[in-house]
C-alpha cells in the first residue's frame, strides 16, 4: 500500500519548508508519496481556495496543514473544508497557545496538531527585512528546529499516522497527534552529553523568545528609529540560537554520539549512534 500524504502550505513558517522532506529524506520511500499545494507567500482567500481545491482533487489519506498563526480564518477555513471532504488533518503552526479562544477550539476539535513553539515570527519591517535577511533568518531557524530535536519529534508523529494508514485505518479512526513542542519535548532523548542537551535547550528557548521581540518591533512600536533595532536584535537572537545548536551537535560528534534515524524504503525507521556503523 502507498499512503498519500498531502501538505497544504498556507503562507510560510520554517516547519513548512521541511514538512514533506522530513518524511522521505532520500526520496526513496516506496510506502508513501507526498504532494504539496501552496498558497505562496500570502493568505488571501483565493490563494487558500486554490490549495484546498487542489488537495481535494488529489484525495490524500490525510493532510498536513502548515501555516503561521493557525487560528486565523484562512487556515481554519481550509482545514474545515478538507475535513468536510473526508480528509483528516494535522495542523502544524507556530505558538498559538496564547490565543485562548482559537487554541481552545483547536484542542476540542478532531484535528491533530503540532504546535512548534520555537517557529518564531520574522522581523518583517521593510527598513530591515530584505530577501537575504529573510533567507538568513529562516536558515537559522531551520537549524534550531533540526538540531534541538524538534524536527525529529515532528517527523515521528507524522510517521505514526502513516503507519496507521498502512494498517488499514482511515478517516475518523486515525489517532492524530496532539503535541505542543516545548524545549523539554524537543531535546528529550536526543543527547548523550548533558552539556549538549543544555545548549540545545537554550537554543530552543532563545528561538521561542524571538517571537515576542518581533511582535514588539512589528506591531507595538511605531517609530522606525526604535523598531529597526528591535527586530534586528530578534534576528541576532536567532543567529545565536543556531550557533548554540551547532555547538550542541559538535559536542555529540566529539563523543561519537550523534543519533541518526533514517527511513528504509518500506518506511521502517532504523537507528544508529556511532558514525562507522550500520543502522538497525
UniProtKB/Swiss-Prot annotation:
Disulfide bonds: none
Pfam families named in the record: MTD (PF01993)
Biochemical pathway: One-carbon metabolism; methanogenesis from CO(2); 5,10-methylene-5,6,7,8-tetrahydromethanopterin from 5,10-methenyl-5,6,7,8-tetrahydromethanopterin (coenzyme F420 route): step 1/1
GO terms for MF: ferredoxin hydrogenase activity; methylenetetrahydromethanopterin dehydrogenase activity
Transmembrane parts of this sequence: none
Protein's UniProt keywords contain Oxidoreductase: yes
Catalytic activity reported: 5,10-methylenetetrahydromethanopterin + oxidized coenzyme F420-(gamma-L-Glu)(n) + 2 H(+) = 5,10-methenyl-5,6,7,8-tetrahydromethanopterin + reduced coenzyme F420-(gamma-L-Glu)(n)
Keywords, comma-separated and alphabetical: Methanogenesis, One-carbon metabolism, Oxidoreductase
EC number of this enzyme: 1.5.98.1
Enzyme class per UniProt: oxidoreductase
Name of the protein in its database record: F420-dependent methylenetetrahydromethanopterin dehydrogenase
Reported function: Catalyzes the reversible reduction of methenyl-H(4)MPT(+) to methylene-H(4)MPT.
BP GO annotations: methanogenesis, from carbon dioxide; one-carbon metabolic process
Family, per entry: Belongs to the MTD family.
Amino acid at each position: 500500500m502507498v499512503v498519500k500524504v498531502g501538505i497544504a502550505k498556507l503562507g510560510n513558517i520554517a516547519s513548512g519548508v521541511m514538512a514533506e522532506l522530513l518524511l522521505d529524506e532520500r526520496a526513496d520511500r516506496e510506502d508513501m508519496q507526498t504532494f504539496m499545494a501552496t498558497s505562496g507567500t500570502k493568505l488571501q482567500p483565493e490563494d487558500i481556495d486554490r490549495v484546498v481545491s487542489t488537495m481535494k482533487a488529489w484525495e490524500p489519506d490525510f493532510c498536513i496543514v502548515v501555516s503561521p498563526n493557525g487560528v486565523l480564518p484562512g487556515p481554519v477555513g481550509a482545514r474545515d473544508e478538507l475535513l468536510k471532504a473526508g480528509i483528516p488533518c494535522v495542523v502544524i503552526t507556530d505558538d498559538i497557545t496564547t490565543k485562548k479562544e482559537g487554541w481552545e477550539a483547536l484542542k476540542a476539535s478532531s484535528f491533530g496538531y503540532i504546535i512548534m513553539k520555537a517557529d518564531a515570527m520574522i522581523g518583517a519591517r521593510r527598513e530591515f527585512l530584505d530577501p537575504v535577511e529573510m533567507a538568513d533568518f529562516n536558515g537559522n531557524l531551520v537549524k534550531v528546529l533540526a538540531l534541538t530535536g524538534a524536527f525529529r519529534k515532528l517527523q515521528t508523529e507524522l510517521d505514526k499516522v502513516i503507519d496507521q494508514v498502512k494498517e488499514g485505518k482511515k478517516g475518523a479512526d486515525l489517532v492524530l497527534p496532539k503535541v505542543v513542542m516545548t524545549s523539554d519535548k524537543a531535546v528529550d532523548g536526543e543527547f548523550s552529553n548533558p552539556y549538549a542537551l543544555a545548549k540545545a535547550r537554550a537554543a530552543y528557548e532563545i528561538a521561542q523568545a524571538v517571537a515576542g521581540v518581533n511582535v514588539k518591533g512589528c506591531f507595538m512600536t511605531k517609530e522606525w528609529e526604535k523598531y529597526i533595532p528591535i527586530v534586528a536584535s530578534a534576528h541576532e537572537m536567532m543567529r545565536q540560537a543556531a550557533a548554540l545548536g551547532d555547538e550542541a551537535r559538535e559536542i555529540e560528534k566529539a563523543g561519537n554520539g550523534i543519533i541518526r534515524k533514517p527511513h528504509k524504503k518500506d518506511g521502517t525507521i532504523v537507528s544508529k549512534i556511532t558514525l562507522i556503523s550500520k543502522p538497525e
